[in-house]
């Protein structure tokens, strides 16, 4: 099964600035088949529900012809997304983004507080994403080559990054994508409720080497 990605690519004139706001060509934001883009980093949401919401936001953004590409106006999408309650499909005012600013807005549309990732209101560029996205505590930073050189292990909602050039959103699972361990997710929820823990604490426990055994013991502790 082919894996598809969503991305902000280039303006209607084949450039990076001074185009007309909105998706004039129909390809400024677009859906494409996965390709080998020299990816150096995979950013994966720790919560599968967040990943799903990010992918849906990306699809809505690509489908909305009021959202175009312009590096000099890259943060205007964020302003309009806020006005639209983070529903990218509901944006009515022509605005602009670029590849990395688009990914950040998709994360915000999924409910992630990305304020810590921004610098004076400017979305992190590709070379800043590893450091800035990590500050939210909501994402894993993955550099295993199997995720970067093939689509097989990718999951819907993953963010692929070439840290010197480009970033895209994965829109469907690869053929060998790990399946969500529903029992483990249920144990995490039970531990959070039982011990009145914050999401951050549960996420920290989940990074422990034997996290699945630990969560099961805590969830079922007598």
Describe these PLM feature segments.
Residues 220-222:
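Interfaces that engage single-stranded nucleic acids at replication/repair/recombination sites
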């Amino acid at each position: 099964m082919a894996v598809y990605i969503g991305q902000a690519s280039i303006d209607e004139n084949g450039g990076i600035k001074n185009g007309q706001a909105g998706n004039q060509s129909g390809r400024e934001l677009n859906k494409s088949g996965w390709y080998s883009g020299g990816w150096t980093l995979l950013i994966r949401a720790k919560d599968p529900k967040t990943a799903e919401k990010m992918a849906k936001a990306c699809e809505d953004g690509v489908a909305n012809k009021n959202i175009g590409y312009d590096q000099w106006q890259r943060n205007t999408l964020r302003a309009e997304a806020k006005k639209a309650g983070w529903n990218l499909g509901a944006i009515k005012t022509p605005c602009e983004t670029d590849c990395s600013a688009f990914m950040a807005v998709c994360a915000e549309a999924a409910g992630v507080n990305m304020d810590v990732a921004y610098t004076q209101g400017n979305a992190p560029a590709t070379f800043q994403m590893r450091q800035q996205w990590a500050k939210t505590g909501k994402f894993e930073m993955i550099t295993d080559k199997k995720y970067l050189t093939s689509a097989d292990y990718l999951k819907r909602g993953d963010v692929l990054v070439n840290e010197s050039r480009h970033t895209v959103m994965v829109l469907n699972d690869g053929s060998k994508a790990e399946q969500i361990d529903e029992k483990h997710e249920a144990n995490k929820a039970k531990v959070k409720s039982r011990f009145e823990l914050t999401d951050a604490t549960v996420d920290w426990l989940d990074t422990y080497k034997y996290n699945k055994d630990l969560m099961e013991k805590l969830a079922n502790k007598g």
